[in-house]
């Protein structure tokens, strides 16, 4: 049964401005440490925009937004063996997922020229 669903569209230009102004500091503020290691040197802005879209969709699925002690670094976008994105929640985000009774996550992520979009589904 679906217990949460979230969707987000992130403008790549908005992420590019943060990257241009703060660089690695911007990335470390929104990425989990495992994601920082996986961030490609080529086109980091598209990577950041995609990860941010998933994180926004995830907090919508959790029903919390970025509040109650849940921040972007509590949500990790990992990579499944076949290469698909997968959600790994940490800290209060993981506790909220457990409180919802969710045991599975589904993530869809896509990039266009100007945007990155993501859908997250939480399932019990």
Swiss-Prot record:
The principal location of this protein is cytoplasm
Broad EC category: transferase
Q: Which residues bind Mg(2+)?
A: 8, 56
- Provide a GO biological process annotation: fatty acid biosynthetic process
**What's one Pfam family the UniProt record gives for this protein?**
ACPS
* GO MF entries: holo-[acyl-carrier-protein] synthase activity; magnesium ion binding
Where in or outside the cell it occurs: the entry states:
Cytoplasm
List membrane-spanning regions: none
| Cell membrane is among the record's keywords | no
Q: Which UniProt keywords apply?
A: Cytoplasm, Fatty acid biosynthesis, Fatty acid metabolism, Lipid biosynthesis, Lipid metabolism, Magnesium, Metal-binding, Transferase
Gene Ontology CC: cytoplasm
Q: Which reaction does it catalyse?
A: apo-[ACP] + CoA = holo-[ACP] + adenosine 3',5'-bisphosphate + H(+)
Please list the cofactors this protein needs.
Mg(2+)
Q: Does the UniProt entry include the keyword Magnesium? A: yes
The EC number of this protein is 2.7.8.7
Tell me the function of this protein: Transfers the 4'-phosphopantetheine moiety from coenzyme A to a Ser of acyl-carrier-protein.
Question: What family does the database annotate?
Answer: Belongs to the P-Pant transferase superfamily. AcpS family.
What is this protein's name? Holo-[acyl-carrier-protein] synthase
């Amino acid at each position: 049964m679906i217990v949460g669903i979230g969707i987000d569209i992130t403008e790549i230009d908005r992420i590019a401005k943060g990257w241009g102004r703060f660089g690695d500091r911007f990335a470390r503020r929104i990425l989990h440490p495992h994601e920082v290691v996986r961030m490609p040197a080529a086109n980091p802005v598209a990577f950041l925009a995609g990860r941010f879209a998933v994180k926004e969709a995830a907090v919508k699925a959790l029903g919390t937004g970025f509040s109650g002690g849940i921040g972007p670094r509590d949500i990790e976008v990992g990579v499944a063996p076949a290469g698909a994105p997968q959600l790994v929640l940490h800290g209060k985000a993981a506790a909220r997922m457990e409180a919802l009774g969710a045991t599975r996550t589904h993530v869809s992520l896509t990039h266009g020229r100007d945007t990155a979009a993501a859908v997250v589904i939480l399932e019990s």
